[in-house]
């Protein structure tokens, strides 16, 4: 298994694609939860392992949601946006991740 310089497996970066910053995800942060965009084939145990390794926090639970892509039109022709999988990660008491830094 390939590891980066800080000891985190490179495959963790393939699981967690980035934070999902919306008004709703900001409201959920009051309940000690963070929302991430994740790979479509990522499982809950893999997401938990990746978040714990990447951010050095303890994860209490992981809930996932698959948002189906909308049908849009471009130059009169219909196309479909990609599906997005989101993970709502609830952290243990006293743990926090600040995803808004650097935005």
Swiss-Prot record:
UniProt keyword list: Ribonucleoprotein, Ribosomal protein, RNA-binding, rRNA-binding
Domain of life: Bacteria
Gene name tied to this protein: rplW
GO cellular component, as recorded: ribonucleoprotein complex; ribosome
UniProt entry tagged with the keyword Ribosomal protein: yes
One annotated GO biological process: translation
GO MF annotations, alphabetized: rRNA binding; structural constituent of ribosome
Subunit structure: Part of the 50S ribosomal subunit. Contacts protein L29, and trigger factor when it is bound to the ribosome.
Pfam families: Ribosomal_L23 (PF00276)
PROSITE patterns referenced in this protein's UniProt entry, alphabetically: RIBOSOMAL_L23
Family designation: Belongs to the universal ribosomal protein uL23 family.
Primary role: One of the early assembly proteins it binds 23S rRNA. One of the proteins that surrounds the polypeptide exit tunnel on the outside of the ribosome. Forms the main docking site for trigger factor binding to the ribosome.
Entry protein name: Large ribosomal subunit protein uL23
InterPro entries with a match to the protein in the record: Nucleotide-bd_a/b_plait_sf (IPR012677), Ribosomal_uL23-like (IPR013025), Ribosomal_uL23/eL15/eS24_sf (IPR012678), Ribosomal_uL23_CS (IPR001014)
Originating species: Zymomonas mobilis subsp. mobilis (strain ATCC 31821 / ZM4 / CP4)
């Amino acid at each position: 298994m390939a590891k980066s310089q800080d000891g985190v497996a490179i495959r963790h970066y393939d699981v967690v694609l980035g934070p999902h910053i919306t008004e709703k995800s900001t409201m959920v942060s009051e309940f000690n939860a963070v929302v991430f965009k994740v790979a479509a084939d990522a499982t809950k145990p893999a997401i938990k392992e990746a978040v714990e390794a990447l951010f050095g926090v303890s994860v209490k639970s992981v809930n996932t949601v698959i948002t189906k892509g909308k049908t849009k039109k471009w130059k009169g022709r219909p196309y479909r946006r990609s599906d997005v999988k989101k993970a709502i990660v609830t952290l243990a008491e006293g743990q926090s991740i600040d995803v808004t830094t650097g935005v």
